[in-house]
């Protein structure tokens, strides 16, 4: 069955972004850096805890509605992440897709630094470089 054209367009955009990132920081260096990262926070345990688990998502824009005005800087992303954790969120996703959601890995980093709960990268993952 052929892949829908919209999906091809999205994947092509992600692959172009990955190629640009890899031109700046080679995959070998990314792998080396990953060895020094903090231990991942356990999202599965957070979701399987007794009671109702809450997952939320941070994104700077929505393709059909445009930008979310109050998320205009890394500081605003960090502040929102902190506020959501204080409100009781158990797992937080951060939209890193630049083309449609105006997200970035920097958004993911500042959100993760602002909270103690597990973070999930929300993006189209098509290449080992992205992991």
Annotate each language-model stretch with its function.
Residues 96, 122-123:
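Small/polar loops that bind or transfer phosphate-bearing groups
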Residues 62, 124-126:
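Short beta->alpha connector loops
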């Amino acid at each position: 069955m052929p892949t829908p054209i919209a999906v091809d367009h999205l994947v092509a955009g992600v692959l172009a972004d990955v190629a640009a990132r890899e031109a700046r920081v080679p995959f070998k260096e990314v792998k080396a850096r990953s060895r020094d990262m903090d231990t991942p926070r356990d999202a599965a345990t957070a979701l399987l805890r007794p009671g109702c688990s809450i997952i939320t998502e941070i994104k700077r824009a929505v393709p059909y509605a445009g930008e979310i005005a109050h998320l205009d800087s890394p500081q605003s992303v960090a502040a929102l992440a902190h506020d959501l954790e204080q409100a009781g969120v158990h797992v937080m996703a951060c939209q890193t897709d630049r083309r449609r959601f105006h997200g970035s890995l920097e958004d993911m980093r500042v959100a993760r630094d602002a909270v103690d709960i597990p973070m999930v990268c929300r993006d189209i993952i098509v290449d080992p470089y992205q992991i």
